[in-house]
Amino acid sequence: MVAVVTMSDKNRDDLIACCKGVADMIDWLDSLNARPGLAELGTRLDSLPVNLEALKQHLVYTEDNGYQRNIIKKTEHYEMVAITWRAGQDTPIHDHVGSDCAFLIVEGTSTETIYELNEDHLAVATDVRHYAPGDVCAAEEPDIHRISNDTNGNLINLHVYTPPLSGFGIYEAA
């Protein structure tokens, strides 16, 4: 359902050389030596310039029904991931147990469906939000959601998890 690739040091260095926004975000995150606050992370992503063409040259997509996680950098305090979706691909309904998540929509339209659990522990949709390029979404745990690409084009989101995503719950829809 999900494919994961960690960028090689060479690809990451090439991306950082071509994409000042990504380089600056990594420098800021590395300078903290701690877990950044979600509000500040969202603010920084909101003003982050991303060289889309440079980023696209370093990303891959999966062709199955899932999505692709392109890990740019991971430390003990954060994980930066460019996630790609082809048309019709989505995540399972999930949470981020123990991690906060903020993401910037780089290309395409991202659809976030928010869920709450009913008495049977099944996920019931309560809200749907659409994000365009340049929009930022910041989700505190235990936010339960699904991200999907409901368009005919590709979708790229730049995610930062704090601390790195080490576990998550998967939920069945009601």
Model-based region annotation:
Residues 1-53:
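N-terminal leader/capping segments at the start of a protein or of a new domain
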Residues 57-89:
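A short glycine-rich, His/Asp/Glu-containing loop-to-beta-strand
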Residues 87, 98-118:
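Glycine- and acidic-residue-biased ligand/ion/polar-headgroup-sensing regions
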Residues 102, 117-144:
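Short acidic-glycine-tyrosine-enriched beta hairpin
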Residues 147-151:
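Asparagine-centered strand-capping/turn motif at beta-strand->loop junctions
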